[in-house]
Amino acid sequence: MNCHYFKNQTSNRPLYFNSRRVPFNEAQTLIKKILPDAGFTSAYETISKWPGYQPTSLINLDNVADALGVKSVFYKNEAERFGLKSFKALGGAYAVHKCLEMLIGKNHVSDHKSPKIKKMIAGITVTSATDGNHGKSVAWGAKMFGCKCVIFIHEKVSKNREYALKKYGAQVVRAGKNYDESVKIAQEKAKENDWHVISDTSYAGYSTIPKHVMNGYEVMIYGAVIKQRVRPTHVFLQTGVGSLAAGVTASLFRNLDYSPRIILVDPENADCWVQSIKHQEPVACEGSLENLSLIHI
């Protein structure tokens, strides 16, 4: 990916502008090849029927908008979603649902509370590596449908995040010095034990489940932005491993009739996206978890 580098005039943080940004219609076509409309439709129809589902708040920050001299600034509040206090509540849980559909059939998953299907699902184990948020969604989804869940976290993940995962019934295993190592260990253990990996990170030969994760994130933005007819000009997203940013971007381009500007925020000491853009190939970074890609308003 080619990019132009610019020095930020208000801070020491660099800005990178993607010089390969394609026209809106072409972007829509590319997105729909990777994430077809049917995947989003299925995700919305499924998630919107879950107990307690409702669109989460889009908060209008009038004071911030006035200070910046712009018309409006909105903050997407996902903390209230299903009581998880997580901005990634939808992706992992929906991927668990799709995984179970692939294993036992769609009709059986819909009937997951019947004794016969309960017993069938109870013999299935899903697993994932996480820094906290994705794993919480996977654990919550596993608990909702009744399957077992094993979550791998690396040595730097906080105790509070570990306890939050256990709250939803997951077996939590500390393994690896960083997230990438935890991902590899989760893959290995899944192969050894016939578990099913629910990852928001794709790799060679593994892309179907991450696409379901992204479809889940599409529902998040659809409910609060598209259905409420909010028309953003600029959208700021944390990068993480990329699935949330990709899912939100896909939902915007799928449902809007114009192209908003998408701004990705990378943590300074774990800037894998910035480095990957600079080197035009995927780059692994081993940064401190003290540096998170948060957007401060």
Language-model region placement:
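PLP-dependent amino-acid enzyme catalytic core
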Residues: M1-I295
